[in-house]
Amino acid sequence: RGLVGSEMCIRDSSIGYHSKSSTKLVAKGIHSTIYSGELTCLLGANGVGKSTLLRTLSAFQPKLDGEILVLGKDIDTYSDKELSTTIGVVLTDKCEIRNMLVRELVGMGRSPYTGFWGKLSKDDKRIVEESIALVRIEELASRMVHTLSDGERQKVMIAKALAQETPVIYLDEPTAFLDFPSKVEIMQLLHHL
């Protein structure tokens, strides 16, 4: 039902929030098609619903109306397991992570592919190291996550999403917290991918 070669197709979708007594509509009539291999940026003023749209596209919250297809399949029909191997997400939310090395956090991107115990195979470890190298954070790999600056943490979360090896990756403000040279570096990396 999606367009041939499209990764994502949004048709007449409405986004917002349900509460017990009401629904808050953030945006309606959203239409878009994003094709494989494209780097697409969503720009807009603060408060217009960019993050709400991203959370909806990631299936973190339900859409209010319309249709969202990812790889030709309605987002509402994906299981949690299917979502974790289809969509990678990097949010700007800061979570406090203690007692974990950067390499271990990036390795968590492999969790959709590991067994119950989460043990990384030789291939998983290779993918983790490749993801770390792609984002150029090799010097951070053995550091504790809680010691990182905001910009360093952002790069680590991008490496984690890359290690997840999903066909679709959503990034909410991927250059937030980064200094100018790092912003340029991340945008070049995303363009290269």
PLM features per residue range, with description:
Residues L43-A45:
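The feature captures the beta-strand-to-loop junction immediately N-terminal to the Walker
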Residues G118-K119, M144-L148, E152:
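Conserved ABC ATPase signature
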